[in-house]
Structures are given as structure tokens and as C-alpha cells.
Curated annotation (Swiss-Prot):
It comes from Rhodospirillum rubrum (strain ATCC 11170 / ATH 1.1.1 / DSM 467 / LMG 4362 / NCIMB 8255 / S1). It is a multi-pass membrane protein. It is found in: Cell inner membrane. This is UPF0761 membrane protein Rru_A2625. Gene3D superfamilies: Winged helix-like DNA-binding domain superfamily/Winged helix DNA-binding domain. Its main location: membrane. Belongs to the UPF0761 family. The keyword Disulfide bond does not apply. Keywords: Cell inner membrane, Cell membrane, Membrane, Transmembrane, Transmembrane helix. The chain crosses the membrane at residues 29-49, 61-81, 117-137, 157-177, 201-221, 224-244, 264-284. GO terms for cellular component: plasma membrane. It holds the Pfam family Virul_fac_BrkB.
Length: 440
């Protein structure tokens, strides 16, 4: 009997272990994907993505020729890249323009050739147009990622200069390496693979788009963006771009005939529509990357049974306590933005909203780098004022119950369950709370 019971328990244990390795239920996967999709759709509406895409498409139409002209001028300064200039332009048009490529390539080459004869003032105008495009891209992504403070003008200048000079040089180097390896293969008679031989017409554009958009989402916004978040947004944008490309070609070649409406000018409106749709996809990927932290935070709050009110109160108290500690320790610079992010473990959007409310109420002050200090003596700042700054009503239930964040429980229990006394606790008293001090 004992052996049978042991065998039965062992079998049940193995079954339980096997069940733990089974995939998540499809219903749960669909619910998770659905909740994230709804969050992204709301963010697309909030940020007015159609308007941003239209602005970028119009600016890109003006800046396309200046950008290519600047890139070719930079390559012309290096004799080794002379043979790669035409190949680079043709490859860009072939990769990213799905409709009437030959006409668009001819027009671009004509405009670039005309730009080569411009005076110094004309070159300055071309450069300014290219910089305006980069400014528009940066401001759009900063808005999507909720960046409150833009880069310093000098930092912007360095970033833009790096993009305008480094991008063409890297592309020229890639094409030169490709030509060099192809020449070796023909000379030696062996199958030396060129990097561009491996990037077939099917895989090349998606891989390039995935890499470029990942770097775009990581480097352009003036805030840290995790690689996984940027890669996820880039993957969404790349897949959407591939689907959009097929749909666009089907509509443009079968459904709507631009030649009938515009005749010889048909390439221009089609190209403008394609640029608008392409920027809409790029911005959608940026919104996806920006909303991942907020979605993860919402899931954690749901699992912990903590509502939005308690989460905002927790963030506000952690920020105020960190500022008070910096003040008490004589740190003139205050609690840094990086320290606050690590302390609250909160997405920038949620933290920025709380900081804005506290700043507006005069409870803290912020410097240009985002560091914070109390707006006045911590002994004169009460929990009730923090609640009022966040426009929150006092939590219901017993002190330390579900409405109160865990980190406040010890400090609030010192009030003996008296709400009035609890809400009158000063920021200095919260700093002195043992569990709070241990956590922070």
C-alpha cells in the first residue's frame, strides 16, 4: 500500500511538472495581445499620429534631395567611394520606393545633379532643410516617448552632424566592401560571399528596416529606451511595412490609376502617399515601443491588486522622500532623475505626470537635469498636501489596507488608525519610518 501511494504521488508530481511546462492558454494570449493593442490604439489617437505622419511626409519630400546631395558630397570627399555613389542612390530608391522607381530615380538624380552647382548660400539652404527634417523627427519621437526636456543645442548639433556624415560613410564603406569581395570572388574563382549577396531582395529591405528603426527608437529620443522595447517596436513597424507595401502596390496598380488622374505627374502623388504611410508605420512602431513599460506596469498593478490611485500615491511619496533625504544629507543637486527611475521602477510617463503635479503644487523643485529637491522644509509638507497635489481622495478602509501602498503602512500605523492624524504626517516623519527607510 505504501509503495502504491508513493507511486501515485510520484505520478501526480510528474503530471503537475508536465502541466507547468505546457504553453499558456490561447485565450490568455489573445486577452494579453488585445489589452496591449487597445493601449497602443489609444496612444495613437492621443499623439495624433496622422498629423505627425503628414508633417514628416511633407518635410521628407522637401528634404529628400538635400539629404542625398549632402550624402553624395560627403562621399565625393573620399576618392575611394567615388564608384559607389550611383549604386547607393539606386539601391535606396529600389529598396524603399515600391512604385515607378525608374521615374523617381531619374528625377532624384536630376535634382541632385542640379544641386551640385549651387552656391555656398544654396548649400546652406540644403543643409538647413535636412536639419529641419531631423528636428521634426526628433520632436515627434520625443513627444511619443514623453520626453519633457530636449537635448542641449550643442548635443543636437553633434547628433545631427554624426547622422549626416556617419550615415553616408557607413553606407559607402558597405558598398565598397561588397564590391571588393565580389572582385575577389571573380579573381580567385571561389565562392566568397558578399554581405549584399546574402541580403536577398526578399530579406534585405526588412532586415535593414528592422535595424534602422531599432537604432532610431533607441538613439533619437532624449531618454533611455531598452533594446528589447526598441526591437519590439521595430519588429511591429517592419511587419506592418511589409503588409502595407503589398497592399499599396495592389491598390495603386489595380484599383486606383494615378496615370488617369495625373498623367505624367502620377509618380509624385503616389510617392507622397507612400511616404505618408511609411512615416505612419514608423511612428506606430515608436508608439509600440513607448507603451511597453506602461503596459507592463499596468499588469503588475493588476496582479498586485493595486489601483491607479495607490500607484500614484506610492510614486509621489517615494519621490518626495528621496528629495527630502537628498535635502537632509546636504546634496545640493537633489535626487537625480536616474535615481528616481531606479527607485520607483516606474515608466517615465507615469513618473512625469506625478512630478508635474508635485511641481505645480510647489511641493518640489526641479533643475534642468531633472533632479528634485523639496519645495520647502520637509517638516512642513504633509501627506494630505501630497494627496491634494495629486487630486486624490484619502484611501478608504483601515490604515495599511489595500488602498494604502505597502511602503506607507508602518508610517501610517504610527498614527494609531486615526485618518486625520495619518494625513497630517509630515514628509520628515515619512523619512524616519523604518520600513520606508529600508526600502529607499
Amino acid at each position: 500500500m505504501v509503495d502504491d501511494e508513493n507511486r501515485r504521488r510520484g505520478l501526480l508530481g510528474r503530471r503537475s511538472h508536465a502541466r507547468s511546462w505546457l504553453p499558456v492558454k490561447p485565450r490568455r494570449i489573445l486577452a494579453t495581445a488585445g489589452s496591449f493593442t487597445i493601449l497602443v490604439l489609444r496612444a495613437l489617437i492621443t499623439h495624433d499620429i496622422p498629423r505627425l505622419a503628414a508633417s514628416l511626409a511633407y518635410t521628407s519630400l522637401l528634404a529628400l534631395v538635400p539629404l542625398i546631395a549632402i550624402a553624395l558630397a560627403i562621399l565625393a570627399a573620399f576618392p575611394g567611394f567615388g564608384d559607389e555613389r550611383e549604386r547607393m542612390v539606386a539601391w535606396i530608391i529600389e529598396t524603399f520606393v515600391p512604385y515607378r522607381r525608374t521615374e523617381i530615380l531619374d528625377q532624384v538624380e536630376h535634382f541632385v545633379g542640379a544641386a551640385a552647382g549651387l552656391t555656398a548660400l544654396g548649400v546652406a539652404g540644403l543643409t538647413l532643410t535636412a536639419i529641419i527634417l531631423l528636428l521634426t523627427i526628433e520632436s515627434s519621437l520625443n513627444a511619443i516617448f514623453r520626453v519633457e526636456k530636449s537635448r542641449h543645442p550643442l548635443a543636437r548639433l553633434l547628433v545631427y552632424w554624426s547622422v549626416l556624415t556617419g550615415g553616408p560613410l557607413l553606407m559607402g564603406l558597405s558598398f565598397s566592401l561588397s564590391s571588393y569581395l565580389v572582385a575577389i570572388r571573380h579573381l580567385v574563382g571561389t565562392d566568397v560571399m558578399s554581405p549584399f549577396d546574402a541580403l536577398t531582395p526578399t530579406l534585405g529591405p526588412p532586415l535593414l528596416s528592422l535595424t534602422a528603426m531599432t537604432l532610431l527608437y533607441m538613439l533619437v529620443p532624449n531618454r533611455p529606451v531598452p533594446l528589447f522595447h526598441a526591437l519590439a517596436g521595430a519588429l511591429v513597424a517592419t511587419l506592418a511595412s511589409a503588409l502595407l507595401r503589398s497592399a499599396f502596390l495592389m491598390v495603386i496598380t489595380r484599383g486606383l490609376s494615378y496615370e488617369t488622374l495625373y498623367g505624367a505627374l502620377a509618380a509624385l502623388p503616389a510617392f507622397l502617399v507612400w511616404m505618408y504611410l511609411s512615416w505612419a508605420v514608423v511612428l506606430m512602431g515608436a508608439v509600440t515601443a513607448a507603451e511597453i513599460p506602461n503596459w507592463k506596469m499596468a499588469r503588475r498593478l493588476t496582479r498586485a491588486g493595486q489601483d491607479e490611485r495607490a500607484a500614484r500615491l506610492r510614486i509621489a511619496v517615494e519621490i518626495m522622500v528621496a528629495a527630502a533625504r537628498a535635502y537632509g544629507e546636504g546634496q545640493g543637486d537633489g535626487a537625480s532623475r536616474r535615481a528616481l527611475s531606479a527607485l520607483t521602477a516606474t515608466p517615465d510617463r507615469r513618473q512625469a505626470g506625478v512630478l508635474r503635479d508635485l511641481d505645480k503644487a510647489g511641493l518640489l523643485i526641479r533643475d534642468e537635469d531633472g533632479a528634485v529637491l523639496p519645495g520647502r522644509d520637509p517638516r512642513r509638507i504633509t501627506l494630505a498636501e501630497i494627496l491634494h497635489a495629486l487630486t486624490l481622495a484619502p484611501p478608504t478602509g483601515t490604515v495599511g489596507g489595500p488602498g494604502w501602498p505597502d511602503l506607507l503602512r508602518h508610517a501610517l500605523e504610527t498614527a494609531g488608525g486615526d485618518y486625520d492624524r495619518a494625513l497630517g504626517l509630515s514628509l520628515d516623519a515619512l523619512v524616519q519610518a523604518e520600513p520606508l527607510g529600508a526600502r529607499i
